[in-house]
Amino acid sequence: VTIIGANSPASLASRPIKVLLCDEVDRYPASAGTEGDPLLLAQKRQTTFWDKKTVIVSTPTIKGSSRIETEFQETTREEWNVPCPKCGHYQPLRWANIVFDRHDLKKGVRHKCERCGRESSEYAWKAQEIKGHFVAANPGAAARGFHLNTLASTFCGWQEVVEKFLLAKEMLDQGDPEKMKTWVNTELGETWEEPGERLEDTELVNRRE
């Protein structure tokens, strides 16, 4: 195992690589010194292996300049789907379907089924994880790609996600978008669109019960 920094052109060009793991690629510099794109430099080192493997992982950043967004669009674009506890319809857990009372979070956070429209608790949805599977939007692609948000995580509760959202929304209303940017990138696993493009009018920042 060899660990190399994305800003080190000499290291990137110094050895053949059969299995390449690129982590947090959205934070790579645009160029490794004067040598060019570090991701392309690293992939160039795999050309001698017919059975090479490449894994590219990242939290997304800014829409239009995100490396992982660009890479993901060229893949199978698979989303984790679980069945509705009420009707059995398979679907990804989406923020647009999260329901809560912002004035009384003790009432719990629920997810509304995209087909039957009925609401179920976090516990009910996560109990369905054992039946879950990935569904591809672009199954004919040569490379597989996967997207997960925090709603599907067994390590973080939905109430915590909502609390972070409400804090970020409060700061956004005061003119500071940084916490909301971080929330969108890290909790939803989505790219952030800069102010003036669409954010103020989306359901994202206007979630209500």
Residue ranges and their predicted role:
Residues 1-209:
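Short, flexible loop motifs at catalytic/binding sites
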